[in-house]
């Protein structure tokens, strides 16, 4: 591919296109990948479709002002994002250790973007072009639009609008608002006069002209009073709906952050149009010498079938970004993309995914949403399925069958996650059976996250009984179709509400499973999530009940170690945790014990542990007692398990 297949990145590109001045310049923290899994590509192509000229400055050197000047001054303004991930999440682990890789950068190496990229980029643009309008968007801006707890500072920060000095913030899915804002700028309206576009947030000196709004506790209040913080979050959480949501206002000293109600979800026709735009579908050629961009590997042969999620997991911020209403593409649109993939020179016959945030949420949760919006005080699938929930996999199954029939397609995988409780609510097992037959390869990754019902309740996840029923059914189906396929559960330690007792309960469950997870995710308090609010305040903002928070680093290490109790280096922490919790009954050589009395020799541990794990599997796995399963295959399949992102 040549540079002409991409949006312009240099003066040479502008000259070839006979462009003197660009209308917009997108500055992004990711490398430039022209694929619909990347927000920069979507916004750039949407604006191009509307007749605007758009250039890309990807990962500029923030210590060199000339990098921000290389495409000149845009006619209408700069559009700034940190990339597909919040820059702080991208740079640091849950234990605040610096990451050494970055899948969104050349060669997968870190160091191509600054911490708090949106703020840094905006400040540099203001330095280069003082009067040029700046619009910020993407996940980092979207989830930091109000005063928010910042895990890395361990304090409440102001709205990112205040810290970045940007003129306007677009939150959530940006296609509709960016088109409306850009057209207003084209018609001659000044950026500081654009105040009525849904899906935008701006700063105002006074709010006398506003009508029908809710003022939430101010920055000064939420930064000094945790009850006020919880109250502010609760209001934000309930008002993120395009039909019933109101304008929200939060005072920051003498000014106000004003969030307009969300944009309506994209229609199916609009979704189809977005994904039919002329993407190059790969990274820019300038990265070839550096090894390309690793992030393209997971998405190049994957298909986004829909956006949004009504699962409402507490630790996920999708409610604030993509919303609870499903926005899907038509089958024709998806089939065209699948057919197009088969003609790509490096296509090997495998489509890696057909899904979204939750693969089997292909349609809206209920018909009520279409007229009245999402329910304010009720979730669709938690704590149990709403009576209005439409449980049906028929359309999704029909789509998958059609893709399987496309010439040169050998296999269609589902990797974006299956909501197992929704799957269990479906009385028709046809989808479940074909999922096991055609759409997984040896193992299915699912996310029970925990096993303690009190923790699951705070996570917004289904109870242990639901997961147990799913596991049994999964293995029953695999037995019927004569397949030796396994489950790889995602598990999380140190989530709000998880004390040592709950962690030990999960460790005992893992013992009965018969193998130790190779990767365990510590709870990560990222901006915008309900769980992060619990973590900071010690309060569940939706119920106002107090929540136990494992903040002590020693206890967090204990909880993590308990989930991998057979690892030699975890022995001392596990023993200390069991003694602290008065569970010495789990220390010894009995069948239910997690660790022996004495620390094993490290050299022989791996061999002995593998043997012990297999014995536990044969004796204690209630779901698989009579199945002829190769233990070697099981261990091999688990070794492929990658860390959750």
Swiss-Prot record:
Cofactor descriptive note: Binds 1 [4Fe-4S] cluster. The cluster is coordinated with 3 cysteines and an exchangeable S-adenosyl-L-methionine.
Basic residues bias: start-end ranges: 600-609, 632-645
Name of the protein: UPF0313 protein CLI_0267
Keyword entries, A-Z: 4Fe-4S, Iron, Iron-sulfur, Metal-binding, S-adenosyl-L-methionine
Residues binding [4Fe-4S] cluster, per UniProt: 309, 313, 316
InterPro entries: Elp3/MiaA/NifB-like_rSAM, rSAM, rSAM_horseshoe, UPF0313, UPF0313_C, UPF0313_N
Region (Disordered): 598-645
């Amino acid at each position: 591919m040549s540079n002409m297949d991409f949006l312009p990145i240099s003066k040479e590109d502008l000259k070839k296109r006979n462009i003197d001045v660009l209308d917009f310049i997108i500055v992004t923290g990711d490398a430039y990948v022209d694929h619909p899994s990347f927000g920069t590509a979507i916004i750039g192509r949407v604006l191009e479709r509307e007749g605007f000229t758009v250039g890309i400055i990807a990962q500029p050197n923030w210590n060199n002002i000339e990098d921000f000047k290389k495409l000149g001054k845009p006619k209408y303004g700069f559009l700034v994002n940190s990339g597909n991930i919040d820059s702080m999440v991208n740079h640091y682990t849950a234990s605040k250790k610096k990451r050494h890789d970055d899948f969104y950068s050349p060669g997968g190496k870190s160091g191509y973007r600054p911490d708090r990229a949106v703020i840094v980029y905006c400040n540099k643009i203001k330095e280069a072009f003082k009067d040029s309008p700046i619009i910020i968007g993407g996940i980092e801006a979207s989830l930091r639009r109000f005063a928010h707890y910042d895990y890395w500072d361990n304090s409440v920060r102001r709205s990112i609008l205040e810290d970045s000095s940007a003129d306007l913030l677009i939150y959530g899915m940006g296609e509709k608002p960016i088109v409306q804002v850009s057209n207003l700028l084209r018609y001659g309206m000044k950026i500081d006069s654009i105040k009525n576009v849904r899906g935008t947030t701006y700063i105002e000196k006074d709010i006398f002209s506003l009508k029908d709004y809710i003022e939430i506790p101010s920055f000064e209040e939420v930064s000094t009073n945790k009850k006020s913080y919880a109250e502010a979050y609760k209001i934000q959480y309930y008002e993120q709906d395009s039909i019933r949501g109101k304008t929200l206002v939060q005072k920051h000293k003498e000014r106000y952050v004003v969030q307009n109600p969300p944009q309506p979800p994209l229609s199916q026709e609009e979704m189809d149009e977005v994904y039919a735009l002329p993407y190059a579908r790969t990274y820019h050629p300038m990265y070839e010498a550096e090894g390309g961009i690793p992030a393209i590997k997971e998405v190049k042969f994957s298909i986004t079938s829909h956006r949004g999620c009504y699962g409402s997991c507490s630790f996920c911020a999708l409610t604030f970004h993509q919303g609870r209403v499903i926005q899907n593409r038509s089958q024709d649109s998806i089939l065209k993309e699948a057919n197009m993939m088969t003609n790509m020179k490096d296509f090997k016959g495998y489509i890696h995914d057909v899904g979204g945030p939750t693969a089997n949420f292909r349609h809206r949760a209920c018909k009520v949403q279409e007229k009245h919006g999402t329910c304010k005080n009720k979730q669709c699938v938690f704590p149990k399925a709403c009576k209005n929930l439409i449980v049906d996999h028929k359309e999704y199954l029909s789509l998958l069958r059609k893709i399987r029939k496309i010439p040169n397609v050998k296999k269609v995988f589902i990797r974006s996650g299956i909501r197992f409780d929704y799957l269990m609510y479906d009385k028709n097992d046809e989808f479940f059976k074909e999922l096991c037959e055609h759409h997984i390869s040896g193992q299915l990754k699912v996310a029970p996250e925990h096993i303690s019902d009190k923790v699951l309740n705070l996570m917004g996840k289904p109870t242990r009984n639901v997961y147990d029923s799913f596991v049994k059914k999964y293995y029953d189906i695999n037995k019927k179709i004569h397949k030796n396929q396994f489950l790889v559960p995602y598990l999380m330690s140190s989530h709000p509400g998880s004390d040592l007792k709950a962690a030990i309960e999960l460790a005992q469950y893992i013992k009965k499973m018969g193998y130790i997870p190779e990767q365990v995710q510590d709870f990560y308090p990222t901006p915008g999530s309900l769980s992060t609010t619990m973590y900071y305040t010690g309060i569940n903002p939706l119920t106002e009940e107090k929540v136990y928070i494992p903040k002590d680093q020693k206890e967090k290490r204990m909880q993590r170690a308990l989930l991998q109790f057979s690892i030699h280096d975890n022995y001392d922490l596990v023993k200390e945790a069991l003694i602290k919790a008065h569970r010495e009954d789990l220390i010894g050589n009995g069948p239910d014990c997690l660790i022996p009395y004495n620390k094993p020799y490290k050299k022989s541990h791996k061999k002995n542990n593998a043997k012990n794990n297999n014995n536990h599997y044969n004796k204690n796995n209630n779901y698989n007692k009579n199945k002829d399963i190769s233990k070697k295959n099981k261990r091999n399949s688990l070794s492929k398990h990658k860390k959750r992102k």
